[in-house]
Amino acid sequence: NGTLAAFVDALHELDIDVSIIDYQEHAITAGFDADAAAYVECEVNGIPVHGAGIASSINVASLCAVVSAVNRALTELDE
């Protein structure tokens, strides 16, 4: 996914190292304007985490999933 790769590259510029291990996506409603869900398993600065995102666009849902995972990892680092 080019959008996801570009986002991961941008995070790297902020010293947030994200390695995506697994990525899944699917529609959660039917029809032309279906909402999408995305799930990522990744390592953020060496911490294994999962993230999920839901949006009307699969690209936005994917970005939200990565943000969710990054937030989880950064919270663990702060503890």
What residues fall within each predicted segment?
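Polyanion-binding surfaces on beta-sheet-dominated domains and ring/shell assemblies
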Residues: 1-79
